[in-house]
């Protein structure tokens, strides 16, 4: 479905992403992890058209999309969420989602957008009440709204950016289960950027790890968690995989 080859992004003399290549298969959930500043968001911004790569290729469903404008990428079947939700507070919950649906698939049909909004809100567990205010949503509700907006665009590939940020343990588990439900029931392929590795590892099919803009590991969650390079990046050279798991458990618990 998605083939990324030799992706590079430079900002002046700083290289944020350096020669990263990977593939994502139809129906897969790929976890993308790494320390702050490792290049995760930069890759998402290039996949979604917000940034133009310095070099490299991004091929989605057989079409080269590197440098394509964001609105065309959305119409082409890639939707994304953002780490920090920024809804339109003058619009209702329903209107926020319908607006995304209106522009997402390029049909500019109000009826189609409203139908997409109803389905997306139902999927994430938010009411389709057309008068409910965005201001009544807490952290978990805003994350659901962000996800519903992305789903309303009708994506074949969903880029989920830190869907667990700011949530408690129960809400984190629910959000992770929601991503798996979206894949299982809607057939949407997902790339998931997340810092809460303990939760991510139980949901994804594969994991890719970045450090300083370079891919340092890729594979099954169990293999990546025991990779010495990954352990060193997260905890230092004297750590082992059990310490990595314990550290991530504490992070997920907010300790």
Regions found by a protein language model. Name each.
Residues 1-255:
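Glycine-rich phosphate-binding loops of nucleotide-dependent enzymes
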